[in-house]
Structure formats: C-alpha cells, structure tokens
From Swiss-Prot:
CDD domains to which the protein is assigned, alphabetical: HisKA, REC_hyHK_CKI1_RcsC-like
Domain Response regulatory: 987-1120
Assembly information from the UniProt record: Homodimer. Interacts with AHP2 and AHP3.
Superkingdom of the organism of origin: Eukaryota
Region Disordered, residue ranges: 918-981
PROSITE patterns attached to this UniProt entry: HIS_KIN (PS50109), RESPONSE_REGULATORY (PS50110)
Biological role: Essential protein. Functions as a histidine kinase and transmits the stress signal to a downstream MAPK cascade. This protein undergoes an ATP-dependent autophosphorylation at a conserved histidine residue in the kinase core, and a phosphoryl group is then transferred to a conserved aspartate residue in the receiver domain. Required for the development of megagametophyte in female gametophyte (embryo sac) independently of cytokinin.
Pfam short name (any one): HATPase_c
Ranges for domain Histidine kinase: 402-671
UniProt-recorded name of the protein: Histidine kinase CKI1
Knockout-associated phenotype: Cannot be transmitted through the female germ line. Impaired megagametogenesis visible from the four-nucleate stage, with two normal nuclei and two degenerated nuclei, leading to female sterility. Normal response to cytokinins.
Parts of the chain on the Extracellular side: 34-345
Gene label: CKI1
GO biological process, any: cytokinin-activated signaling pathway
C-alpha cells in the first residue's frame, strides 16, 4: 500500500497537492462547524448549574445517610454477642432474662448515643425492652410465651429507675404483638443473621417511628433490637438548604419520611413510585419511575416542568428512597464573545496548516519514493526466500514428527519385546542382566527423544501448560526421595530445606505439576551428577509477587493479541505502562503466589563467565562435563519451561569460600484456597523474610491444660491471652545426632521454628555427655553448642505468626508447668558411630531420667531387627518433610501421648503400621487430623521415572512387626490389586499396522487375563470386523454381549487411520445403540494435539506405545461405565 502511495506522489505531485488541500479545507469546515455548535451548547448555563447543584445536594444527602447512625449495626452485633455469651441453658425463662439479660440491655440503653429502644426477644416470644418516652423511661416485657396454647400472651409496661434500670411501681397491660411471626423476626432468625427496618417502637405510649437494627444471636435462641428515632434523620434533612428545590423520601413499604416542597398536597406513593397531582375532584396523576437516577426524568406538574433525580441511601442497613425535584427556569449565555474570538483564531491557524502541510507532505513523499522503490525489489527477493524457507521448515517439521512417531513406536516395541524375553529367562542370570541393560538404554533413548521434542515444541511455540490441582510439598518430597538413594551411593546427601515453612501453608496449588517436576528433576539430576561429596539442598518458599520480583508474567498477551495491543501504544513508554498495569493486576490477585526454588550443591561449580551461556542449547561446561555424557539441552529446556510458567531462572552467588552452584528459579502458581483479609499480614511477614510457623497443612495439634486441643492454624492472639493465664512447665526436647552437617542445620532450624527446644550433638562421642548434662543445669547455664540452642534469645524469641497475621510472641504461654509430661525425643543416625555403643548410651540415659519424663528414640538408617528397646522406631529413608512432621507428632505438644510403661507388641505393630504416629494407650487417644492434613498416614516407597514424558508413583504400606519404616524389602503393595488376570474373560481387538506393536500389545493383554485377542493391520479391517460382529450379534439374539470388550486403535495407519476408523465405528454402533470402549495407541505425548484429536474423534482414552498405564486407563473406563 505504501509503495502505491509513494508511486502516485512521485508521478503526479500537483494532483496530490490539490487533493490534500481540498481534504484539509473540508476538514477545517467540519471542525469549525462542530466548534460553533459546541460553543453554543456551552453557553447554556442552566444545565451546568443544575448539575452542580444536584451533585452537591446528592453528596450532602448521602453523607447524612452514611454518618447518621453509622455504628448502630456494630453496637447491635456487639450486644448480641455479649448476651449470647451469658445464655447457657437451652430454655431461657423470663427469670433468667430479667436477672441476666435485662442489666445488659440497660447498660446498652444508657451508653449508646441517641438510642430510643433496646429489646431482647426470645424465639418463644419472651421479651424485655427499655423504651425512651417524653421525659422518662419505661420497660415493656412479656413474661409468657407466645406459643402457649392458653392464649394469655400479654405485654406489660412499667416505669424504671433512670440510674439503675430497676422496675418501679406497678405494671400495666399494654397492646401486645406476636413479634415471632413478623417478617423481620423471621428474617433475622433465618440465614440472614441481621436485618433492619423502619417501624414503630415495641410498646410504649408515644409509638415513635424508629429505625430498628435487629441481630439474631449466634445460638438462634433469640434476637436483639436497637431502635433509633427517625426524627433525628428527618430534622437533619429538613435543615438542608435546597436552593428552591424539593426533596421527598420514603421507605420501601411506602412510609413517607421527608416531604419538603410546594407539592406536598399532591404527593403520594403508588407501587413504590412517587406520584403527584391527585386532588379531591381529579383522577389524573403524574408518577416518576424508579430508574430516573441516570440522567433525570422530565415531568410536568401543575403546568410547571421539573427534572427529577432518584436514588437510594442506606441508613443503618435500611434502604431509603428519595427524589430531588429541580424546576427548569431557563438561563443565559455569558461566554459568547470569547467563543467567537477563539473561532476566528482557529480559522487562521487552520488556513495556514491547510496549505503548509500538503506541501511538506508532497516533498517528504517524493524523497521517500526513491528509498521505497529500492526496497521493493529487495523485499520481493526476501519474501521469496522466506516462503521457500517456510516450506522447507514445514516439511522438516512434518518429517520430524513422523520420524519421532516411528521412533517412539520402535522403542516401545523394543521395550515390549525385552519384557517378553525377560519373562522367559531366569531372574538374575546373565541374559536377564543384559536385557535389563538394553531396557535402560531404551529408556535413555526415550529421554533423549523427549528432550529433542520438547525443544522443538518450545521453538515452534506449541508448548502448552496443562494445569491441574496438586500438592506442592508432596511433589518436592517425591523428587528428593527419588534422587536420595542415587546420591547416597556417592556419599552425597539430598536435603529438603523448607526455609520459612510457607511452602507448606500454600502447598495446595494449581499449575502444571508435570513441567514443574521436570524442572526440578533436571536440576537435581545435574546436581547429583556433578557433586562428588557434601550435600545437595533443595530449598523452597512462597511470597507475594512484588515490584522487585523478576517474574515474567505468563499471562502477558502473546501473538496477535500482543500485536493488537502494540497498535495502540504510540511509543515504548506506553507499551511499558501497559505491561506494568498487567503486572500489577496479577500481583494484586490474592490467589496468585510466587514460589521460589533453590537447588544448592557443593559440586565443582560453574565459572562466572559461563553462567549466561550455560542456558543456551547444546552448551556444556567443559570443566564440569568431563566424564559425563549429555546433549546440553537440559538447562535450555529448563529455562524455557520456567519462563513459560511465568518465572525466571538464574545462578546465584554463593558466600566466599563455598564451592558448588546454586540455581534459583521462581514460578507463578494459583493457590486453591482464597486467603482471608488477615492473611495479607502473614504474607507481609513472609516477604519481610521472617520465620513462618503457622502452617495449617502440617496438621500439628497442641494439647492444652483444659483437656482439649488447639490446632496451630486456629491460633489467635485472643486465644493466646487465654492460654497465658495458666502456668506451664518445661516442654519437650529434641536431641539430634545426624551425620550430615547440612541436614543437621536444616532440621535444627525447622524444629526451633516450631517452638521446640533442640540439642544438637555433632559426634557420637559427645552424645553421652550431652545427655548427662541435659537436665543437670538450668536453661541459663552454658554447655557449648548443645545447650546454646536451649537458652539463647534467638531460640526463645522465635516469631510465632498466627493465621490472623499477628506476631504472637509476647502472648505465647511460657513452657514451665504444662499439664502433660515432658518427652525427650532422640533422633539418632546409626551411621554416626557404633550402633551397640549408641544403644548402651541411650539405655543409660533412660535409667537416669527424672520421674515424669519419658524418652522416645528414632533410629535413622538402621534396621529395626537390631533395635532392642521396644517402642523405638527405625527409619531407612531420609528424615524430612512429612516423615519429619510425623516424628514431631510423637511429642505431646503436637498430639503425642506419654506411655507409663513400654508398649505391648500389638501396640508396637500399630506404631509401625501408621508410620510414626505417636503411641496409643486405652486411656489416651490422640486427636488425628482430617483429610486436609498433608501427611499421608501410609508413608512408603515412592518411585518416579526419570524421564520427562512418563512417571509412575507406587505407594507401599509398611508391614507390621519389628521392621524398619520405609525399607523397600519390607514393603508390600496395597494401593491397588495386581494387574495379573485383570481382564479375565475379555475379548479384545488390536488394530495396528506394525507387527511388533501388535505382538507386544497382545502379550501384555494376555498377561492381564484376556481370553481372546484378535488382530488386524488397518482401520478398514477393524471397521469390517466390528460391523460383522454387530450383525452376527443381532442375528444370534445375544444383545447383551458386544463383539469386542475393548478396541486398541493405532492412530496413524495407511489406507484408513485410527481417527477415521473410530468415526465410522461410532456411526455403525449408533444404529445398534451400543458403544465399545476404544483406546487410542500412539507414539505422541499424552498432552499433544494428536491426543486431543483422539477424544474429538470419539475415542475413550489415550495411551502411548509403551502401554505402561494400560491398567489405570481400563480401571478409569470401567469406573465411568459402572
């Protein structure tokens, strides 16, 4: 288009000039005409004056409604809560009302400003009320129930003492009303809880109109009502200076409160609308609709025109409607001369621009013509080259997709054939070992193919996130548990560092768990690969996305939407402003949290000059990659996935002298539970870097001296004040003897943050001395590092943040005299020293324990067969996350109980079965957390595949008896039954053009008990078999039996592919009224576009060529069918 314009300017500049000049003149004429019209409208003074007056009056009326009786509802709610706390019996009689509730009512009657009535009404009609009359106060009460069948429900009126509220003189009967059947009473007793209305007082002689604020008691035993005179509101409104305007106000039910104007004699309410004009000998009337608030409503009354504006104000919860009437009296113009002068100035400027701008434009376009024509030829050549490159790229992508599909199919067939061969050889033989090695190589090929495919998807922009609900803390623990055995073979410990504990509070999130696990797996795998000694720490915490955060917003518009947005941004500053607005909107979302992860190792490290290039594809650090094979795609894919999830990854600097590398990345995830307003303070505490302790997902329960229990998630400062009133004893202590220094430091810090005193022993030789001195000195004594953790201020003054976001350190009860016995929990790593000598030290310590203090021992990395003391627990898996919290639940502060004698064998088996649940006796029962607790009672072995495309998790429960918890050889699978004989008696059709794939699928189905497997190599053959089977079924009359119970359909086949075959089969089945489950089998990923097309084609499920999830898919289909 631009080329055509420049060509036209170059060939005929005079014509272009004339056209442009004409257009400018026309534009000027239109502009001047609009200017004149606008100026004439502006000189009309009445509209502006009326609008200003209306705005000011409306503002004054709304302020009056806002600040008159502003706190009546709060007063009513406060009085209701106080009365509710005094009512203890279910059936409260009039005597209790007169002696307990009446004094509270009189206190409210005496202290609340402008109150005219304070009443309490029980749900059976018993009532007591204080009412203000002319110069005195009276009490109106009903001492009998309105539900009585005797019909003697009566109200009495009696004067009261102005100072004490006591009844004086004799009572007199007054007009009674069954308030329990009124609309406002029923509304307050229902789910509404509060209500308000305008009505007369409950009793008394004046019958003054009041604004009644009614609040139901939380126990639903009655309600409380406060009445405030309407006269105060009307006096304030009548005192307004309306500047000759008229004001009318009424309630929803038609009660007129204010009528201030000359139309009082003809004013009335009809069906909620205000009407005028009704006279004694006239039937006409003029009504104003309720929706006249937007632009005003023109009405003519008594030959005068008015403009009416309607609105609603809320006074103490009661909506009041009002109408402002403005008479139209005309106006005058005062700025006409200024407008005419500005008009002439504008004409002069436009004439100058009308001739100057076209000349400049023609000259500029002629200069640009030469450059444009030269660029045209270059652009044509570039477009042809680009189109050719795009065709090549499309062909390459298609060829790569087909090749990857074939490679996946071949690898799946290879793995299937390996499984078939392994079934026929002796386990542990040389052939079995060789086959196992071949299987490992096949898995490596699949992992390599997945990496290449992921990079291809990322480069083409086809990578998409699959959001789902998952538990973040469990995902972290599963990743670490998977790599811990591999790292321990090298002498490297993998530690989970919860940092401030915030990741447990916000553990239930929504996002792509598969991609997040892929990121963590890659980083931890690299850390294990390049670390030969020391440790690997995986650290995580949550924080609000702040202005200094490096988060790259994943919701920022991409593609066409981004281009459209950029069309309206004139420069980079506007584009940056738009980007900032989106960033602020996401950061202000209360459900969006930024999760920061760190993978810190003590390996060889990455040089400073290689830190940026290490995230590029096919780049490896030579200094650290020697002896390790790889493609160099891992970190490049990780960076792309992190950015896709709305974050950024970087390598952080470590302290001087520390070796290794620390990768840090952050992602945006959505929390599933909307945090309350008070949680904002908690998040501010997280952002400030303070230790966070209130983690509701931990399921920690603290036993109180009152015999009940208190959950940390419900802790509030008010409850802490209640606790602090009773004296407490010295609490439990934890003694840590761990081999790895980093695990020791992380565990110590986390237990301290929970408020438990910790003694750390670095060497096993110091254990005896530390245990002897444990109770030999006061907490103020000095005994080196072991006692410092019990006495230093940083331990005693740990911040304890409740769910209301308030620091409760000053309100926490001091641990000096607790009602339960203290416990010393010993956590000992058996690899720190000789096991039997450690056992002797523990036995000697137990013999010397003071009365009332018990000892519990958790042995790490040790088989329970060597644990001699009954009641001791052994664990062969790393102590962190849920297992650490289950250990802490053995303490009485967190729900554990103290046994007076060693547990029986049956009790010990229960201990091992429930995995670290505290000992139980018939007299003491531990309160357990509900389903929301993050700690699965079935701790066990979790195995995750290292590939990015597939993962499996097997949960095994621990056998009862004297077995260590978490030991793989002592676990049995209980989460689901065996897959053997799962499809006994079923008839299956396998459709695949590859013979090996059919053979592998047939073998697996036979192992699952399938009685008959029929094979075919094309979709057309499958359609024929299904059609013939349905026809024979109809002829034989066996309508209850399908030709095939399941059909496994390959997606890509010659002649007729799986998609078309499925559509045709569904058409045939529709005529018979049946549906056979069709499971798609393809070499593509489950989350790919091809997988979504299978569902659209009518297939019931999707499987990759490996068929690893075959049993799960069939179970899911069967569950939907039944």
């Amino acid at each position: 288009m631009m080329v055509k314009v420049t060509k036209l300017v170059a060939s005929r500049p005079i014509v272009v000039f004339c056209v442009l000049a004409f257009l400018v003149v026309v534009f000027e004429c239109i502009w001047i005409s609009n200017w004149r019209t606008t100026t004439e409208n502006l000189v009309k003074e009445v509209a502006s004056f009326t609008e200003d007056l209306r705005t000011s009056l409306v503002s004054e009326i709304e302020n009056i409604g806002k600040f008159t009786y502003a706190k009546t509802n709060l007063s009513t709610i406060g009085l209701a809560r106080v009365i509710d706390s005094y009512i203890t019996n279910n059936d409260t009689g009039f005597t209790e009302i007169q002696t307990q509730i009446a004094p509270l009512l009189f206190v409210a009657y005496s202290t609340i400003l402008q109150v005219s009535q304070v009443s309490y009404i029980s749900r059976d009609g018993l009532m007591f009320s204080y009412i203000a009359e002319s110069n005195t106060s009276v009490a109106v009460f009903a001492n009998s129930s309105s539900n009585s069948s005797r019909g003697d429900y009566t109200w009495y009126t009696q004067t009261v003492d102005q100072l004490t509220g006591r009844l004086n003189g004799n009572s007199t009967k007054s007009q009674s009303l069954d308030v329990t059947h009124t609309d406002w009473f029923q509304a307050a007793q229902s789910n509404n809880y509060t209500t308000a209305f305008v009505g007369t007082s409950l009793g008394g002689e004046d019958n003054e109109t009041l604004i009644q604020s009614v609040v139901s008691l939380y126990s639903k035993k009655g309600l409380v009502s406060l009445g405030f005179p309407v006269k105060t509101l009307t006096e304030v409104l009548n005192s307004l200076n309306l500047h000759g305007e008229e004001l009318y106000m009424w309630t929803k039910d038609g009660t007129v409160l204010v009528r201030e104007g000359s139309l009082n004699d003809s004013f009335f309410i009809s069906n909620g609308s205000i009407c005028f004009g009704r006279e004694s000998n006239s039937l006409w009337s003029q009504c104003i609709p309720e929706n006249c608030s937007s632009s005003g409503y023109e009405v003519e009354i008594k030959r005068l025109r008015y403009q009416a504006f309607c609105s609603v104000i809320e006074v103490s919860g009661v909506p009041l409607r009002y109408t402002l009437m403005f008479p139209n009296k005309g106006g005058a113009t005062r700025i006409k001369h200024q407008a005419e002068k500005a008009k002439y100035q504008l004409i002069v400027v436009m004439i100058f621009l009308g001739f100057g701008w076209p000349v400049w434009f023609v000259w500029f376009m002629m200069q640009a013509t030469r450059r444009e024509m030269h660029m045209r030829a270059t652009l044509i050549n570039q477009m042809e080259a680009t189109q050719q490159a795009e065709r090549k790229s499309m062909n390459k992508s298609q060829a790569f997709a087909n090749a990857s599909h074939d490679i996946r199919g071949a690898l799946a067939g290879m793995k299937g054939l390996i499984d078939i061969c392994r079934d026929g050889v002796k386990p542990g033989s040389d052939v079995d070992t060789t086959l196992n090695q071949v299987n490992v190589c096949a898995k490596d090929l699949v992992a390599l193919l997945n990496s290449v495919l992921d990079m291809s998807k990322i480069e083409s922009g086809k990578m998409q996130l699959v959001e789902e609900d998952f538990n973040l803390s469990k995902l972290l623990e599963d990743v670490i548990d998977f790599y811990h055995p591999v790292a321990m073979k090298k002498g490297v410990d993998v530690v989970l560092d919860p940092h401030d504990g915030s990741v447990f509070k916000f553990s239930n999130v929504r996002g792509d768990s598969g991609r997040l696990k892929q990121i963590l797996n890659n980083l931890v795998s690299n850390a294990v690969k390049f670390t030969v000694d020391g440790h690997i720490a995986v650290r995580a915490w949550a924080q609000r996305p702040g202005s200094n955060s490096s988060v790259v917003l994943a919701s920022y518009p991409k593609g066409v939407s981004k281009f459209v947005k950029s069309m309206f941004c004139k420069n980079k500053e506007e584009s940056s402003t738009y980007e900032t607005e989106i960033s602020n909107s996401i950061r202000n979302n209360a459900n969006t949290m930024e999760f920061v992860f760190e993978v810190d190792d003590t390996g060889k490290g990455i040089p400073m000059e290689m830190r940026k290039s290490v995230f590029e594809n096919y780049v490896q650090v030579r200094e650290t990659a020697q002896g390790h094979q790889g493609t160099g795609l891992g970190l490049g894919i990780v960076q792309s996935l992190v950015r896709l999830m709305g974050g950024e990854i970087r390598i952080t600097d470590k302290a001087m002298g520390e070796k290794g590398t620390c990768f840090q990345f952050n992602v945006l995830l959505t929390t599933l539970e909307s945090p309350p307003v008070s949680d904002m303070k908690v998040r501010q505490e997280i952002e400030a870097g303070g230790d966070y302790v209130s983690t509701p997902n931990l399921g920690l329960t603290i036993n109180t001296s009152l015999g009940g229990s208190m959950n940390i998630r419900n802790l509030s400062p008010r409850f802490n004040n209640c606790l602090s009133s009773s004296p407490k004893q010295e609490g439990s202590r934890v003694v840590l003897l761990l081999k790895n220094e980093e695990r020791r430091r992380v565990t110590e810090k986390y237990i301290k943050n929970l408020g438990i005193k910790v003694t750390v022993v670095e060497k096993w030789e110091h254990l005896s001395y530390a245990l002897e001195r444990l109770f030999g000195f006061s907490p103020q004594s000095s005994m080196g590092r072991a006692e410092c953790s019990l006495s230093c201020p940083s331990s005693r003054e740990l911040p304890f943040i409740g769910m209301d976001g308030i620091d409760s350190r000053s309100q926490l009860p001091k641990r000096r005299s607790i009602s339960f016995s203290a416990v010393v929990l010993l956590v000992i790593d058996a690899k720190t020293g000789p096991f039997f000598e450690l056992c002797d030290i523990v036995k000697q310590f137990r013999r010397g324990l003071p009365h009332g203090i018990s000892c519990k021992v958790v042995w790490l990395n040790e088989s329970s067969t060597r644990v001699s003391e009954r009641g001791d627990i052994s664990c062969s898996r790393p102590l962190h996350g849920s297992r650490l919290m289950e250990v802490l639940k053995m303490l009485p502060e967190f729900g554990g109980t103290v046994l007076k004698e060693p547990p029986t064998e049956l009790q010990r088996e229960s201990l091992l079965r429930h995995s670290f649940v505290a000992e139980r006796s018939p007299k003491h029962k531990v309160q357990e957390e509900g389903p929301s607790s993050m700690f699965n009672k079935k701790l066990g072995k979790r195995i995750m595949a290292s590939t990015d495309s597939e993962s499996e998790t097997r949960v095994k429960s621990v056998r009862t008896g004297r077995k260590p918890i978490g030991n793989p050889e002592d676990e049995q699978e209980t989460s689901k039954p065996s897959d053997d004989e799962f499809l006994r008696g079923k008839r299956v059709l396998v459709v695949d053009d590859n013979f090996i794939s059919r053979k592998v699928a047939t073998g697996k189905l036979k192992k699952m008990g399938v009685s008959e497997v029929e094979q075919c190599d094309s979709g057309k053959e499958a359609l024929r078999l299904v059609t013939e089977g349905l026809t024979q079924r109809e002829e034989q009359g066996s309508v209850d039996k399908l030709p095939f119970d399941y059909i496994f359909m390959d997606c890509q086949m010659p002649e007729m592919d799986g998609y078309e075959a499925t559509r045709e089969i569904r058409k045939v089945e529709k005529s018979y009224g049946v549906r056979t489950p069709i499971i798609a089998v393809s070499g593509h990923d489950p989350g790919s576009e091809e997988a979504r097309e299978t569902i659209q084609a009518g297939m019931d499920a999707f499987l990759d060529k490996s068929l690893n999830q075959l049993a799960n898919v069939i179970r899911e289909i069967e569950s939907k069918r039944h």
